[in-house]
Amino acid sequence: MAQVINTNSLSLLTQNNLNKSQSALGTAIERLSSGLRINSAKDDAAGQAIANRFTANIKGLTQASRNANDGISIAQTTEGALNEINNNLQRVRELAVQSANSTNSQSDLDSIQAEITQRLNEIDRVSGQTQFNGVKVLAQDNTLTIQVGANNGETIDIDLKQINSQTLGLDTLNVQKKYDVKSEAVTPSATLSTTALDGAGLKTGTGSTTDTGSIKDGKVYYNSTSKNYYVEVEFTDATDQTNKGGFYKVNVADDGAVTMTAATTKEATTPTGITEVTQVQKPVAAPAAIQAQLTAAHVTGADTAEMVKMSYTDKNGKTIDGGFGVKVGADIYAATKNKDGSFSINTTEYTDKDGNTKTALNQLGGADGKTEVVSIDGKTYNASKAAGHNFKAQPELAEAAAATTENPLAKIDAALAQVDALRSDLGAVQNRFNSAITNLGNTVNNLSSARSRIEDSDYATEVSNMSRAQILQQAGTSVLAQANQVPQNVLSLLR
């Protein structure tokens, strides 16, 4: 080996080995201090990517487990509210059983009905006010989607249903004596026809000398106070017929035909209180007369009172629901069946083809095919004002109305079954969430173990590596000192 002083190969070799052992010592210390085998991608590029995917799954599954617990909480909240609704239904059923006993007086039935109404109101309150984190769980049909996995589409649905007295079919539950309810086909009142009032008809009716007259705009008017019909006649020439232009009373037949009596006298002024009509107007009695009629009727078992369902068709061919009516013998009075068993006189409005708000006429079936109508003028009349007090409490009417065959127990049992079905669904979904939580926990444990084997430090190995590196550092430092002394051997050759 040549003796040189410019390059100390032994020193350079020793320094290189010392740097390697120092790097190994640093890596060992980093892994021991962090507990991780992979502290950056350079430690294990593939292992770092795999471990990072495991971390994403583990964090997602951990949150999914918390989501599932939230799902259990909302299901428990809903089920708790349903339990209270069930308690109220059980009490309603108990009261219904009590009301079925014939020993109860009408006063007893009224008291029982009062508590039933309060219980149903409480069911409505629980339904409308029970909420979880701002979500009203029984106020409407709703599907809640709970994320129970780390990936898209891994969900469990909670189907919530609107539960109140109406959806349970109990909003009209009444254990008092009832009116029979049935459907009746009702014929619409006749449409007015002015075909007969052509030129010749107006010539005869007005007593004019020519037949050049016509009905202005083809309109017929009606005065609800005097019960008279009118048309406005106009003439096209400038002869004496012009003086005959104006309003005339006309006759209206049940079939809607409009005619004029010969030589009818023209109205001195435009009639007041008239409105345009397109159908035959045959109003029934006013509320006061209804009261008198009901009071005087003394309805017997052979002449029972019933509730009837009505509808009619307007001039545009639109079918409009006229609601309920109270039928006493051949007379029918427009009414609405209220939740508490009383009845209220109906009001109905609709918009015609020209966009104008019109008074709706409820078609009420009369005796012997006769068609009667009730004019609805925008006012609502409570049955208590029409008959002195609620129809349901009218002695004659209450005794006359045969108790309905409606079975309140069957309706309540159906409501209980509906509540039980939803409670069963909620119980089942809670069990699903519990199962999902258990599975998520197992998966998180297994994935954590897999990730640990990839990125966690093996302390036995790393301590051994650190000890080896430390020894190499100490030895390398000592050897480097010796290697640095080698060039001094050249001095002996120069002496």
Curated annotation (Swiss-Prot):
One of its GO terms (molecular function) is structural molecule activity. InterPro entries: Flagellin, Flagellin_C, Flagellin_C_sub2, Flagellin_D3, Flagellin_N, FLIC_barrel. It is found in: Secreted; Bacterial flagellum. The keyword Secreted applies. Flagellin is the subunit protein which polymerizes to form the filaments of bacterial flagella. Belongs to the bacterial flagellin family. NCBIfam families: PRK08026.1. Individual Salmonella serotypes usually alternate between the production of 2 antigenic forms of flagella, termed phase 1 and phase 2, each specified by separate structural genes. This is Flagellin. It comes from Salmonella paratyphi A (strain ATCC 9150 / SARB42). The gene is fliC.
